[in-house]
Amino acid sequence: MQNISLRKATTDDAAFALHVTEACMRVYAERTWGTWNGLPDFDPATDMIVERDGCGIGMIGVDRRQEFWILERIYLLPAHQKQGIGSFLLQCLIEEAVSEQAVLRLTVLEVNPARRFYERHGFILTHTISPRHHMEWRKS
């Protein structure tokens, strides 16, 4: 996708990570637990910063374990959602998983409509342990 790039996250990205996490997840956290903890959903070891024209617009985190990969997060600031960027990032991850013969797993809060986004990309619901849906993508 034009003008979209990824760079490895660093500890210097913590404030940006908090901003993105809050913009993307606060409403769902409040609907689920009644409160927002104000902590960034961020791990520099697994996260990449999504940039458009060199400016941070989101982040994606993937824990690449030996037996499977976990998509920890794919967050885009609201102004950059619904433009195909998330689909582009997820499709790139799926292609990488195929080449590495990896299964992708994720969880999504029950109140988060992102479940439909993942289903459109071939993820299937494996089980639900409230308040999260557990989903998986594997090459068929």
Where are these regions (language model features)?
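Short, low-complexity, intrinsically disordered N-terminal peptides in bacterial proteins
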Residues: 1-5, 140
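Acetyl-CoA-dependent GNAT
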Residues: 4, 8-79, 89-96, 127-130
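Glycine-rich phosphate-binding loop
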Residues: 84
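Conserved active-site alpha-helix within GNAT-family acetyltransferase domains
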Residues: 87, 111-131
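Conserved GNAT acetyl-CoA-binding A-motif
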Residues: 97-109
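Terminal substrate-recognition subdomain of acyl/acetyltransferases
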Residues: 131, 136-140
